[in-house]
Amino acid sequence: IRDSGVSGAGKSFTAKEEMTNIILTDPNADIIIIDPEREYSPLVKAMQGEVIHISATSENHINAMDMNSDYGDGANPVILKSEFILSLCEQLIGGTNLGAKQKSIIDRCTASVYRYYQQGNYMGTPPTLQDFREELLKQNEPEAQEIALAIELFTDGSLNTFAKHTNVDTHSRLICYDILDLGKQLQPIGMLVVLDSILNRIT
């Protein structure tokens, strides 16, 4: 369901009506909402869905490094997750393009922090961005130390909401990602993590 059109055209009402009809009539259907205006939270709560508030101060957390064995639709999950971590690091560092050395270091550290999780058939507790930063700090290259310093705000600092273990139900059949309070600093990162969380869910 795509909610688009001119203001006042009844988009939200129509979307809510359709969502309600789907949830009540199709037990196999799942609905995932990205809600920038907090329009759908009351309906989702009323239908016993999961509302996930995404912000720097929220008690809801999505681990940016969550990954299941089906991530990426059958390809090597760690390789595909490494591509996501590269994109995420570009945003964490300030939206600048990463150099070849930086990319190699990030790819190496990503493979390293997922090694035991992968060997355990993607069961148990996945790593977090804090684990990823600790792995960066173990590397000898000065570029690794620079990356670790650049992402510290988002792993151990005040914007570390995506560096913690997931504490919400991302498998509910009705999910609303409430991004109204996502500040300017976290917005591009938050959208990346939300979309990756959805990918992790649907593949």
Model-derived features with residue positions:
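P-loop NTPase motor domains
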Residues: I1, R38-E50, I54-S58, N63-T203
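Glycine-rich phosphate-binding loop of nucleotide-binding enzymes
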Residues: I1-S55
